[in-house]
A protein has these predicted regions:
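Glycine-rich N-terminal segment of FAD-binding domains in flavoprotein oxidoreductases
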Residues: 1-36
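FAD-binding subdomain of flavoenzyme oxidoreductases
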Residues: 38-192
Length: 194
């Protein structure tokens, strides 16, 4: 195994990262996850979808959208990032106001640990059952294991979308309007100010 020889494995999703993680040192092994790109299971009753970690994010969203569902995770890199990459970087998306961040969507993870063991880390009933080990992998960028499968909680797709733009005289007025919207408990998926 790589661990027995002291060789670090660097998982590579679709290469949308900007932190230099795709440049392994000569003593490291780059593991291209790009061929692990399949929707493995779609449970429309329980609103769950299991993807291989290398699946393109936009293709994952399109696959569930064909069934009237949504992941609800729309990072700006959605078309060039992978589902496993979202978890590995603890990504946030443009619709996080409405749907949450990636950690809010993860139902379970399948991971290969550094010793080669394949484990599944899933949700457990809320109780004093110990730490939720999924959170160790979220944002770890492959340092604690290689994510091979991700099961995400889905939502029913909105029956319609409405887009609106408004003018504010200055930034302060715009921020005040956004604050009032949030404090009124409205949950627009996206709010931007330019």
């Amino acid at each position: 195994t790589a661990a027995a020889h002291g060789v670090a494995i660097v998982p590579f999703g679709l290469g949308s990262g900007v932190c230099g993680g795709i440049e392994p040192q000569s003593s490291q092994l780059l593991l291209d996850m790009g061929q692990m790109n399949t929707l493995l299971a779609l449970d429309e009753e329980n609103l769950l979808a299991t993807f291989e970690a290398g699946m393109n994010g936009l293709e994952a969203e399109q696959a569930v959208a064909a069934h009237g569902l949504t992941i609800g995770h729309w990072p700006q890199s959605i078309g060039i990032s992978s589902v496993g990459g979202w978890v590995s970087t603890r990504a946030s998306g443009q619709f996080s106001t409405a749907y949450g961040n990636i950690e809010d969507m993860i139902y379970s993870l399948q991971v290969v640990l550094p010793n080669g063991e394949l484990v599944t880390l899933g949700k457990a009933p809320r109780a004093a059952s110990g730490p939720d080990l999924r959170h160790l992998l979220m944002g770890a960028e492959g340092t604690l294991g290689v994510i091979t499968q991700v099961t995400l909680s889905l939502r029913r797709a909105a029956p319609c979308r409405r887009y609106s733009a408004y003018y504010a005289a200055d930034m302060a007025q715009g921020f005040n309007a956004q604050r009032q919207i949030v404090q009124a408990d409205w949950k627009p998926p996206v709010m931007r100010q330019y």
